[in-house]
């Protein structure tokens, strides 16, 4: 009996040792292959990052992957191997080779970490090009000019609520954050927060038929954090897919995963309730995004969206429509209150074009404000809502990306934050200069002064990608610009604004962004005085 027990223990020990040796050998083989035999081995980059995806994962968890990629391109050049199978390309030609029309690349496996229901994809995370085309054709009906104009009243309602908050009027929740104050004739607000409340209220009403009322009540403001946490979880899992496919997220990033699930359940409840209400309302239902999602069909197949697809599209619309707009508006005010000359130009343009605030609506008059558009573009350049590199996978046959051949299966992408700071495309790239977008305008940086040429504007446009480009570019771009134009113009028309403090500012004087796939931000704190 004793001998048998000893032999059994030795046998188990031997098996364990054997497995350990096998694991070490497999790991060593993986590292040696990545370093010396991988087809991407000749592309420069940090040695450790070429051995393991965990370096990139570390920066994803830390929230500074966009800054890390920027530093890598500064050190290694246009093409950088940032992970064993990921190449970051920081050129305008590379941008168009990767994301442009007719290219032999598709969304990477990264996006399989996003679906809330496995196998149910939306316009954002669908990898298959045919599937994406069907979904986009259905969704595009909600973004026609006619449809957007019909939704403008919802947006204007909430913009008016925001203006009332900034004017310090009664009737809104006065339990502000500790950093916010009300003084004689002025209020101080953290506009990173308040723009989030605005955009979530707008998109909540358009996507689910009911506002979250964040502008007037604290009740659902926690949803902003939940959405950010959900995006962060998707991002981290996409950077190392075993977290998702092996369910390791439930062990190593447990709280992120719980918060993501809380968001999923909240949005599922909202979508189910709205679908029932719409069915009861019939023809009387208001024509918002949910109306179009329920009723739109693919013009080629005649098919609409299933209930799970409907929920998925409403989810992604709410997130994408909120994050891009709130980040851009926060960035615009961040830089404007630090550049009094730019703020004065914008104020003069808006106040010279309109006599009453209610005249400021979408349309030709607003679209003719050249400096307003330039301010928004410059905010999008310096503070992109998705600052990292959105990954694409090279399809069969390989692809040449700005002169470098990448074999099938390679993941690659262009980091928005990095290319938007490339001196080759943006002179004095670290300076907020709306004039760079206006042909004939005078640009003044710390050590240079020049007149913007048509060639410079064209060069800047070619490298500009805040909404991505090509067939997978953001379908809601027109909606975002409409909301940003109207909101910023009304604020500039109604208020005198000034810098309150340095909250949200990084060491270089820019708006500090945290890369959670979408950008998280804090601030700016702005002083508002009603005119």
What name fits each language-model region?
Residues 2-134, 149, 156-161, 198, ...:
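N-terminal membrane-proximal hinge/A-helix region immediately C-terminal to the signal-anchor transmembrane segment
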Residues 48, 152, 156, 175-185, ...:
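Cytochrome P450 I-helix active-site segment
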Residues 74, 80, 300-308, 361-378, ...:
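Cytochrome P450 C-terminal beta-domain/meander region
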Residues 107-116, 150-329, 345:
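Cytochrome P450 heme-thiolate monooxygenase catalytic core
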Residues 167-168, 340-342, 459-460, 473, ...:
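Cytochrome P450 heme-binding "Cys pocket" and the immediately downstream C-terminal segment
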Residues 309, 313-316, 322-323, 400-405, ...:
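C-terminal, well-structured subdomains that either form a transmembrane helix-short loop-helix hairpin
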Residues 324-337, 487:
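Short, small-residue alpha-helix embedded
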Residues 414-454:
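Conserved cytochrome P450 K-helix/beta-meander segment immediately N-terminal to the heme-binding cysteine loop
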């Amino acid at each position: 009996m004793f001998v048998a027990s000893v032999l059994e223990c030795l046998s188990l020990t031997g098996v364990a040792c054997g497995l350990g040796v096998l694991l070490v050998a497999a790991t060593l083989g993986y590292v040696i292959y990545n370093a010396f035999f991988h087809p991407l081995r000749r592309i420069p980059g940090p040695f450790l990052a070429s051995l393991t995806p965990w370096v990139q994962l570390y920066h994803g968890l830390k929230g500074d992957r966009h800054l890390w990629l920027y530093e890598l391109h500064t050190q290694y050049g246009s093409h950088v191997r940032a992970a064993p199978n990921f190449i970051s390309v920081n050129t305008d030609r590379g941008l168009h080779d990767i994301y442009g029309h007719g290219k032999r690349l598709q969304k990477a496996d990264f996006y399989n970490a996003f679906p809330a229901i496995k196998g149910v994809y939306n316009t954002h995370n669908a990898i298959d090009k045919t599937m994406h085309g069907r979904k986009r054709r259905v969704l595009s009906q909600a973004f026609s000019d006619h449809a957007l104009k019909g939704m403008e009243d919802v947006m204007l309602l909430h913009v008016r609520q925001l203006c009332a908050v900034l004017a310090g009027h009664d009737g809104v929740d006065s339990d502000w954050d500790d950093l916010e104050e009300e003084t004689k004739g002025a209020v101080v607000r953290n506009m990173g927060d308040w723009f989030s409340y605005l955009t979530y209220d707008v998109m909540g009403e358009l996507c689910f038929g009911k506002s979250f009322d964040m502008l007037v009540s604290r009740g659902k403001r926690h949803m902003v954090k939940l959405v950010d946490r959900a995006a962060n979880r998707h991002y981290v899992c996409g950077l190392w897919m075993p977290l998702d496919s092996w369910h390791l997220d439930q062990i190593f990033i447990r709280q992120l995963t719980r918060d993501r699930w809380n968001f999923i359940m909240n949005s599922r409840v909202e979508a189910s309730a709205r679908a029932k209400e719409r069915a009861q309302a019939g023809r009387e239902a208001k024509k918002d995004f949910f109306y179009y999602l329920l009723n739109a069909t693919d013009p080629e197949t005649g098919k609409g969206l299933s209930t799970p697809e409907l929920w998925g599209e409403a989810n992604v619309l709410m997130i994408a429509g909120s994050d891009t707009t709130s980040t851009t508006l926060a960035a615009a005010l961040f830089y404007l209150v630090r550049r009094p000359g730019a703020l004065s130009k914008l104020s003069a343009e808006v106040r010279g074009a309109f006599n009453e605030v209610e005249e400021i609506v979408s349309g030709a008059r607003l679209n003719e404000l050249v400096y307003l558009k330039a301010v928004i573009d410059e905010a999008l350049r310096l503070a992109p809502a998705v600052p990292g590199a959105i990954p694409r996978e090279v399809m069969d046959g390989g692809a040449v990306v700005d002169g470098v051949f990448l074999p099938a299966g390679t993941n690659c992408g262009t980091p928005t934050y990095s290319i938007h700071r490339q001196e080759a495309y943006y002179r004095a790239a670290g300076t907020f200069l709306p004039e760079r977008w206006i042909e004939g305008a005078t640009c003044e940086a710390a050590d240079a002064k020049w007149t913007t040429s048509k060639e410079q504007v064209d060069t800047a446009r070619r490298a500009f990608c805040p909404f991505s480009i090509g067939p997978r570019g953001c379908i809601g771009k027109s909606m975002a610009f409409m909301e940003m134009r109207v909101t910023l113009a009304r604020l500039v028309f109604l208020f005198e604004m000034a810098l309150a403090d340095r909250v949200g500012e990084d060491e270089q004087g820019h708006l500090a962004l945290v890369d959670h796939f979408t950008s998280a931000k804090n601030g700016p704190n702005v002083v508002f005085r009603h005119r």
